[in-house]
Amino acid sequence: RDYYASRGLGDVYKRQSWCGEKEAFLGRYHGYGNPVGVIDGKLNCEGNYNENSCGALTAVLKLAPGEKKEMAFLVGMKKNDEAEAIVARYDQNCQQVCERELEELISYWHGQLSHFQIKTPSNEFNTMINTWNAYNCFMTFIWSRAASFTYCGLRNGYGYRDTVQDIQGVIHLAPEMAADKIRFMLSAQVDNGGGLPLVKFTHNPGHEDTPDDASYVQETGHPAYRADDALWLFPTVYKYVSETGNVDFIDEVIPFANKDEGTVYEHLKRAIQFSICLLYTSDAADEGL
């Protein structure tokens, strides 16, 4: 095989079986309290395509009365040479390495989520806003619909409108991350003012084909611009400048997707010039703009 998928760490417990489909793991007429995968002790070793996903692994170990053991699994996909270098980090002192990295992860998220905190009489409401709403906004920002579009084969890049909208949810939590993504999406705006309906993962500002080119249509399956894609830059840039006070951002020079460059202000102006004649032809879900 050319790729690693998963690997037991430390006192290696060989992975016996796995499952990527939630319904198969839970089983018919079963639920989270009695999943058939746990009852049977074995899984179907099948992945999942465009259904409800899960990640389940089984391993066999023996415990003496009162004994407990900890297991660690490294899950992901890399080419063999890259994967072996990652796995090597855990070959010595696996437990200490895992504990240290877990603490680093906890510290990272506490830091990210601490930038905006509310306090109301409702602990549940506080937790929803301070933790889960914010965390969900980060996940949406980072993954940009990957689970719902990319992994099921419906998209092979970033959706312009989706990605620009997602930035708004983290501006108050991570303004520098937000600014970098705004710059990225501005660089995916064509010099005519429209946004690339699909921004490739290999995006190369200043050198991209556009929906006007047969090569772009063939590669992405998108034969036309959307009327409102680039217009979503307006509320996003406005919210970033309002939150940070960084008015100089408007004067930054950023390349267009296919050729030329312009200030952020010029990008916004061209978005209006492109879209004003295309009003009333937008995604029904986003007509509020």
Descriptions of predicted regions:
Residues 3, 48-51, 222-224:
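Short Gly/Pro-enriched turn/cap motifs at secondary-structure boundaries
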Residues 2-13, 280-289:
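Single conserved hydrophobic/aromatic residue that forms the stacking wall/gate
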Residues 14-45, 50-51, 56-157, 251, ...:
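Acidic/polar, glycine-enriched structural segments that form the non-catalytic walls/loops
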Residues 4, 23, 164, 230, ...:
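Intrinsically disordered, low-complexity regions of eukaryotic proteins
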Residues 66, 158-163, 167-178, 182-279:
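Aromatic-rich carbohydrate-recognition surfaces in CAZymes
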